[in-house]
Amino acid sequence: MPEGSVLAVRDRRKASIWTIVHPIFAIGQMFAFFVSVGYFVAYLRGAVSYDAVHASVLVKIALMVGAVLTGSFWERDVFGYWWFAPEFLIEDVMTLIVFMFQLAYLGVVAFHRDNMPAVLLMLGIAYAVYAINVAQYIHRTQRQKQETQAAEKMLGIAA
């Protein structure tokens, strides 16, 4: 099987421990995102303090760091690159953009916490960029699964 074929990638994906570990962080991060958005909306309605919102964002960012680290190990095992594998370039670039906005939010909080409109605007932008990243990631994952299934079907291989 050629090294870059869909089935070779599938085999490397199945052989990597990071295929199991990475989704724990990715799903945890997504869950933390939804919780954080809930806190954000509750804050806007006056139901929770800003500190609760900020704490939920910090948890989400910590899980994102875990997802990025485990994702880089996974990418190395599957594609041979720690970061920016040609097959995963869009996802890696989007992740960097998401990180930039998360860090921008933390910067606004650190230096302008008393300017709540600026803090909330930056948080809203960070949430939107993260949501776009999640959508493209889900799309890519589904497309990759379909390509693998098509290759397996064509070669008569059971999953």
Name each region found by the language model:
Residues M1-S5, G66:
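Short, charged cytosolic
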Residues D11, G80-W83:
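Preference for short coil/turn "hinge" residues that link or interrupt alpha-helices
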Residues V6-T19:
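Cytosolic juxtamembrane amphipathic/interface segments immediately preceding
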Residues Q144-A159:
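Short, highly charged, low-complexity non-transmembrane loops/tails of multi-pass membrane proteins
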